[in-house]
Amino acid sequence: NLSFIQEYDVYTPGQDFLFTSKDNIFVAWKVGEPVTKMQYIRKSMFQYEKEWLNGLTWRSWVYNQNNQAAGTLKYIEKEADGTLIQKKDITTSEIGTQLRFAPGERSYDGRSGKESVFNLSKDAPIFKLSHQLGIKGVLGGEYNYNHTEVSAEKRIWLSSFGHIDTQLKAGKVWNKVPFPLLILPNTNQSITIQPEAFHMMNALEFVTDQYVSFNATYYLKGWILNRIPGIKWLRLREVISFNGIYGGLTDKNNPALTPNLFLLPDGTRPLGKTPYMEASVGLENIFKILRIDYYRRLTYLDEPNIKKGGVRIALRFSF
């Protein structure tokens, strides 16, 4: 499978919609802090994917990308003598590869690939290992960098008590790079529930160059509510989730300690010694299709311009 992608669009740093389009009408309904820090992205990408019957998939890519600061986002580089220089844009050239192993998986390979919601075998464990290599001096690339990611996910069945979908991820940026090339935890500022995203974290609130994250969603399948007279006939199903990330910013990528780096934007800080955590409780199968969750932020509660809690919704068919 060989593909070519040419893209010119505007994005919010720290907000990637992994399972839907960012132009989705529901995703466009924002409930978090107003998003004013943007980037114009111009990207050209070749990608090759090969799949084997044993569940192994190999994907490789090469791309050239230009990021231009927009809105209130500024690229301001601090020199060794304290001089501040504003840059209009940055360019990166990258080659990358990913191995994905999901033994026993059966999936519908649509626009979202094997991560589609139409995956027919959610019980299969999924393991991923990827590496991105930035090359300076090729097609205008300005930075050498190495970025490694590894993840594992599995559905755990608890018999009549429902099941838990779990995911463990870790990543590291090995080189000195400006903050747009560091790890920005994925946030969700929309009214919708988005997998693998933090719903109570502001976009660009934290930055890190190494992290470990854990996500778990427990589907109780009506184990509690089906035992309550008068409510059982509604066939509501309980959902509980937890999202957390722990990481840090090494000295070489901290502009407060190392020169020739971009200053962090206002409202952005390194992820500290305390992990960021949030949890939710909710109901699904409302009118057979609707899910409503209440999310609560558990740490970093004293930060300015944050929301400690909020309601998110999703359209989810349950069988």
Over which residues does each language-model region extend?
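Exposed, low-structure sequence patches enriched in small/polar residues
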Residues: N1-F319
